[in-house]
UniProtKB/Swiss-Prot annotation:
It holds the Pfam family Tube. It is found in: Virion. GO terms for cellular component: virus tail, tube. Keywords: Viral genome ejection through host cell envelope, Viral penetration into host cytoplasm, Viral short tail ejection system, Viral tail protein, Viral tail tube protein, Virion, Virus entry into host cell. Belongs to the tail tubular protein gp11 family. The lineage of its organism: Viruses, Duplodnaviria, Heunggongvirae, Uroviricota, Caudoviricetes. Interacts with head-to-tail connector protein gp8, the tail component gp12, and the fiber protein gp17. Structural component of the short non-contractile tail. The tail complex is involved in viral genome delivery. Forms the 12-fold symmetric toroidal domain immediately below the connector protein gp8. Once the tail tubular structure is formed, the interface between gp11 and gp12 generates the proper environment to interact with the six fibers, each made of gp17 trimers. Coiled coil: none annotated. It comes from the Viruses. This is Tail tubular protein gp11.
Length: 196
């Protein structure tokens, strides 16, 4: 089973960590095994934190809508998978949380389900499965945070902030292109005006 604590793995993770190190003028590392290099270990930790932080907002590439989760036949428990960042009811309310590795319904105050539940899932994706603009955003944001915490060069901060802003803008464009958003549909006020 994969570890979702370290969801950024292999050559892609090494490349991302080296990009973070390069942002402050540090030489690249050839491996992340053992975390012998303190800077590489810190960069890796920040990279994984930022990866989870950005993905937890929910984007077109990691939201799965209308998924039915079925309880175990004997225990009536639904396992809360390690790659779930958030479960929401299909009405958009976040009534389901992780309690002891199982789905817990805060409304009924129970982790036992007689039947399946239909939810929208924000799922933690592997780094390689994400669109390029999101990988770029994660690395630039992690680089800026790494600089702030361990290096603190204001001239580097300015450059990294510009790169992060550009990366975020590219992600917003991606969402607009692939999100299927429509200003005439999904807004109660606009729908009311159109049906007059």
């Amino acid at each position: 089973m994969r570890s979702y604590d370290m969801n950024v793995e292999t050559a892609a993770e090494l490349s991302a960590v080296n990009d973070i190190l390069a942002s402050i003028g540090e030489p690249p590392v050839s491996t992340l095994e053992g975390d012998a290099n303190a800077d590489a270990a810190n960069a890796r930790r920040i990279l994984n934190k930022i990866n989870r932080q950005i993905q937890s907002r929910g984007w077109t590439f990691n939201i799965e809508e209308g998924i039915t989760l079925l309880p175990d036949v004997y225990s009536n428990l639904i396992v809360y998978s390690d790659d779930y960042l958030s479960l929401m009811s299909t009405s958009g309310q976040s009534i389901y949380v992780n309690r002891g590795g199982y789905v817990y319904d805060r409304t009924s105050q129970s982790d036992r389900f007689d039947s399946g539940i239909t939810v929208n899932i924000i799922r933690l994706r592997d780094y390689d499965e994400m669109p390029e603009c999101f990988r770029y955003w994660i690395v630039t944001k992690a680089s800026r945070q790494f600089n702030n915490r361990f290096f603190g060069a204001p001239e580097v901060e300015g450059v990294l902030q510009e790169e992060e802003d550009e990366a975020r803008r590219l992600c917003m464009e991606y969402e607009m292109d692939y999100g299927g958003y429509n200003m005439l549909d999904g807004d109660a006020f606009t729908s009311g005006l159109l049906t007059r």
